[in-house]
Amino acid sequence: MSQIKAILVAVDGSPNSDRAVQHSLDMVASGFATEVHFLNVQPGLRGAIASFVSREQIDSYHRDEGNKALASAVGLAGKASVSAQVHIGVGRQGEVIRDFAKKLDARMVVMGTRGHTGLSGVLLGSVAQDVIAHVDVPVTLVK
């Protein structure tokens, strides 16, 4: 099996997300990958709410919520003694995941099949479908 450098794991704090994190950590432990990046994507604030709060407050909110969602993944990586980079993006999930995969030169995206998206999603979940449609690297879905 050939080794890849970077894996990008989309993290939302859901049980399926935790399983995706564990899968990526197992790939690092087995020598399949050398680097793992955890990414949480926060939805952008729009409309009236964005006009009543400062940019600093919005950034702080996204950072706090992103760190909450990433906490479990960071804990799992620590237990596995794997060093992981954490990232918080803002915007449409599929687009942000695609852009981070390119930016990090990730050779694989790993994510849960359904997470915290309001609706449970149909079949794979809307975010997973969006990512599969837009990234140029293999996508591993974990349920």
Language model regions located:
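A short acidic, glycine-rich active-site loop
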Residues: 55-68
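Small/aliphatic-rich secondary-structure junction motif
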Residues: 2-52
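Structural beta-alpha unit
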Residues: 2, 75-109
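Gly/Ser-rich helix-loop-strand patches that form or flank binding pockets
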Residues: 99-143
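General small-molecule cofactor/ligand-binding pocket signal
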Residues: 37-39, 85-89, 140
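Short beta->alpha linker loops
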Residues: 53, 88-92, 114
